[in-house]
Each structure stands twice: as structure tokens, then as C-alpha cells.
């Protein structure tokens, strides 16, 4: 079935590249109007992505204190609301806890978790997310099993697992589903910056013995936003090739 999202409006954070861009493409292919949000420093790449899908760009830092209200105002004024919210934006700043500077801890928690809570508080509180809407958060295998040197990252991704479990019940009355997707090793710019040996180990520590592609994750996210996923909420679903980490 094509155009299962015809008439729907979607927000994808971290939408300039990687999983975010792949998700935006999949949602647009199903008929949704997709608004991609990313930091102003990536505006050129962001514009390229939205031009490809016929969407709209929203250059913004989600950690800015006024970002949630700006997002809410944009969707209320431009579209009367939003149907799909994909919280994809995230970063890593890896250090063992003993060597982690406070600003690195704070940065990861702010982007990966705090900003999501702040945005949803406004979008849900002001009923900008329409009845029957979909919220999908990007968690990680690192939030299920944890990885050495990723205490900050793992804490945020584990936090999202608890967040969707709690929010799903709160939003059920309006027919809004809230789920998370937990990718394993995915071939993105972020993983490409890992040291070679760590990157190769990440690729091979699953039953498929290969890294996943952004499109693999995007396909699941797309499904969770469609009418066929109306019965799925409060869940965290892995896309990891049966990762040996957290098995």
C-alpha cells in the first residue's frame, strides 16, 4: 500500500543525514509532509535533504531554551498541528566516567534526553500533536546493555526506554502511540568517526556479521507511524541483527 501517510505532517529531528534523512525519505514516500530539523551548522545538508523529498527545513538547536515553543508555534501556524514526531537527534561524547568532564556529561544528556522531554512537554501539553499521533524515539542497544566509555550516552538511551513506557499510558486516551527503536551498529557519520578496531568489532558482533544501514532503521520507524502499528505502544524494538551485546 502506498501513501499510507497521505495528509500527515511529520517532524524528524536530526534530519539532515543518516537515520534522520533516511526516515524523512521513507515518510515522504508514504505521502507525509516532512519537516526536517537540524542544527544551523548543518543547514546546507539539511536543505539538500528537504529538497530531495519536497519537505521543509527547520534549522534549530533543540537544546535552546526557546526551541520547544518555536517548534510548537511553527507547526500550529503552518499546519495546525503535527501528526508524527521522530526524536532522532543525538550525539556521543565517549569517555570513561572517571575521565568524563562535566560539560560532556551535560551535553549528551541535554541533547539526547532533556531536549526530547522539553519538546514533548510543549507539543503534548498544548495539544500540538494531533489525536492519533505517533511519537518515535531513537534509543540504542547501548541503552539496553551499555558500552564501556558510554555512561552518559547509555544513560540517555536507557532513559528513553523508560520514557516511552511511561508516556504511552499517559497518551493512550488521545490515541497517541509512543515507541522507541534501538539500533545496534549502524553505518552513519557518527560510527564512521570511531577508531577502526572498535568500528570493525561493532560491525561483526551480531548474527549477521555486518553493520546495519540507516534505511534498516528508517523502515521500522516508518511502520510505527502507519495505521498498521496502531496496536503498538510503549515498546522498544531492536534493529541490531541480533546483537551479541545485550542478547
Regions found by a protein language model. Give the residues of each.
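Active-site helix of classical SDR
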Residues: 120, 156, 164
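Substrate-binding pocket helix/loop in short-chain dehydrogenase/reductase
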Residues: 96-97, 104-106, 202
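Residue(s) in the substrate-gating loop at a strand-loop-helix junction
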Residues: 140
Amino acid at each position: 500500500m502506498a501513501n499510507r501517510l497521505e495528509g500527515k505532517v511529520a517532524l524528524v529531528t536530526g534530519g539532515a543525514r543518516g537515520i534522520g534523512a533516511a526516515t524523512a525519505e521513507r515518510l515522504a514516500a508514504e505521502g507525509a509532509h516532512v519537516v526536517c530539523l537540524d542544527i544551523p551548522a548543518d543547514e546546507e545538508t539539511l536543505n539538500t535533504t528537504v529538497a530531495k523529498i519536497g519537505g521543509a527545513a527547520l534549522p534549530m538547536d533543540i537544546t535552546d531554551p526557546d526551541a520547544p515553543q518555536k517548534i510548537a508555534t511553527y507547526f500550529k501556524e503552518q499546519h495546525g498541528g503535527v501528526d508524527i514526531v521522530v526524536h532522532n537527534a543525538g550525539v556521543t561524547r565517549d569517555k570513561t566516567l572517571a575521565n568524563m568532564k562535566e560539560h560532556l556529561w551535560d551535553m549528551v544528556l541535554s541533547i539526547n534526553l532533556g531536549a526530547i522531554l522539553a519538546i514533548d512537554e510543549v507539543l503534548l501539553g498544548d495539544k500540538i500533536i494531533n489525536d492519533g499521533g505517533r511519537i518515535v524515539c531513537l534509543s540504542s542497544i547501548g541503552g539496553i546493555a551499555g558500552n564501556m566509555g558510554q555512561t552518559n550516552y547509555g544513560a540517555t538511551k536507557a532513559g528513553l526506554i523508560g520514557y516511552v513506557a511511561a508516556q504511552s499510558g499517559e497518551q493512550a486516551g488521545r490515541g497517541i502511540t509512543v515507541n522507541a527503536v534501538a539500533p545496534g551498529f549502524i553505518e552513519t557519520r557518527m560510527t564512521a568517526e570511531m577508531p577502526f578496531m572498535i568500528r570493525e568489532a561493532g560491525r561483526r558482533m551480531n548474527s549477521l556479521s555486518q553493520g546495519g544501514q540507516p534505511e534498516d532503521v528508517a523502515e521500522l520507524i516508518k511502520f510505527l507511524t502507519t495505521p498498521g502499528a496502531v496496536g503498538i505502544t510503549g515498546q522498544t524494538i531492536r534493529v541490531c541483527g541480533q546483537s551479541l551485546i545485550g542478547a
